[in-house]
């Protein structure tokens, strides 16, 4: 696989940070290209003040902040409207990732990203980019029976919404380690009529123990087996994981199938943003 194809596949990649991680980064330009899309994870319990402050820092440094809006921790429409207003007016934010969120039960009236969309507040605030979640390996949280029925129905609804909104939409997925399952999922949703572009989630370089912990927490079942198999190989146990194989396989497939619906790579820097930066430089 040529480095040129990998470079093209990684062009325009995005990263994700928490306010805590962002507070330790003095200058984002030391690690990522100017203009990079930076998602801000809104972990349950994080004050909105910290989220807005982080978004402002990212935008002020010449990057594009995209905060998470987890439906289950938003009490009501007034709170949602306040968050949107603060992001817009205090941090110049016009991007959002709309998700259900990881809270076990809703704080108030919202339980899904569809309800956030139905509020129409993002369109009224002229948000330019609205991204939604994708689940290449399904989601036990959404489909406890192990099927993809609810996930598929929600994605179909959001696809119809994408035709009505002025905002640009994309599907940002949970991370995976298995290229074949990602390719199969991406092709399946395209065949089902979903024409929203996909930004595929990729775990950045990290220790195997870290990957296993996050994989279990995020419920990426098929991928856990891949990491466990690697951990059983004593020659690789002490070596940090790098997403070389999955990036190479996806870049190869994209090169051979230009209409493939995966358009961008979204890195989860589980081992740190510097490790992602170093990996991209090496890969390209």
Where are these regions (language model features)?
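Active-site pocket-lining/capping segments in soluble small-molecule metabolic enzymes
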Residues: 17-19, 99, 112-137, 148, ...
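Short, well-ordered secondary-structure micro-motifs
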Residues: 108-109, 142-144, 183-184, 209-218, ...
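Active-site glycine-rich loop that binds ribose-phosphate moieties when present
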Residues: 144-165, 180-183
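Conserved, mostly hydrophobic/aromatic
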Residues: 67, 158, 167, 200, ...
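C-terminal helical cap(s) of enzyme catalytic domains, especially alpha/beta-barrels
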Residues: 273-284
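Active-site beta->alpha loop and helix N-cap motifs at the rims of alpha/beta catalytic domains
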Residues: 2-153, 272
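Glycine- and other small-residue-rich loops at beta-strand/loop junctions that grip anionic moieties
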Residues: 17, 43, 72, 171-175, ...
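Active-site glycine- and acidic-residue-rich loops that bind
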Residues: 75-78, 104-112, 173-185, 208, ...
